């Protein structure tokens, strides 16, 4: 939804200022930031399918982009997409920190600092651990037309694989400890704030 809305806003905002073929390229880059797209049943990657759609759209709307321009557009979109998710290949401590900092963004109950419950906290960690466990490192980063080169691409994949393993283990340990804390909190009552059990936290202590 975020990428779709970004494309709509970009299209409406820039439509009067730039040529259709340039807007076409911008929207292509925005679409490429949709993450974790798996290959199709016939083995085509997300970038391969995007390239096919660009060819069809270019022909349908007479945008007159050359084959070389279409390929370069997809290559630009790949670079943008890979930068957008570069954190998956970051050093493990940075990956863990980034994952931790995103918890409130995807679990709005945690925005109510010092009032979210032990249950809220446990659910947030459980959802994130389940999400990381579901990711296939082979489908995180993109490539097209030999770019990035195979060595660079495999390095990104293996670093992502390592980070997913570390992140899943870390969150699994957190989940075990908070499940124990949740069991204790139920002896006190339902919907007990985490701060009641552990003390008040600052915004970086999720």
List the predicted regions and their residue ranges.
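An active-site-proximal "capping" alpha-helix that borders the catalytic cofactor pocket
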Residues: 2-16
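Divalent metal-dependent phosphate-bond-processing catalytic cores, especially two-metal-ion Mg2+/Mn2+ enzymes
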Residues: 12-21, 31-206
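His-Asp-centered metal-binding catalytic motifs of divalent-metal-dependent phosphohydrolases/nucleases
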Residues: 1, 6, 27-36
């Amino acid at each position: 939804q975020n990428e779709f809305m970004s494309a709509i806003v970009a299209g409406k905002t820039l439509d009067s200022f730039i040529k259709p073929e340039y807007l076409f390229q911008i929207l292509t880059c925005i679409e490429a930031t949709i993450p974790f797209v798996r290959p199709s049943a016939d083995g085509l990657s997300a970038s391969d399918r995007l390239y096919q759609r660009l060819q069809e759209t270019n022909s349908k709307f007479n945008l007159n982009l050359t084959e070389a321009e279409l390929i370069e557009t997809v290559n630009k979109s790949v670079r943008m997409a890979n930068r957008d998710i570069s954190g998956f290949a970051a050093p493990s401590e940075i990956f863990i920190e980034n994952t931790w900092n995103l918890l409130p963004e995807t679990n709005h109950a945690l925005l109510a600092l010092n009032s979210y419950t032990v249950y809220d906290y446990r659910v947030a960690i459980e959802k994130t651990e389940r999400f990381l466990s579901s990711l296939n490192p082979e489908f995180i980063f993109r490539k097209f037309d030999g770019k990035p080169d195979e060595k660079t691409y495999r390095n990104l994949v293996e670093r992502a694989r390592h980070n997913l393993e570390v992140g899943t283990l870390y969150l699994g340990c957190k989940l075990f400890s908070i499940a124990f804390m949740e069991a204790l909190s139920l002896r006190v009552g339902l919907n007990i704030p985490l701060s009641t059990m552990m003390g008040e936290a600052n915004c970086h202590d999720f």
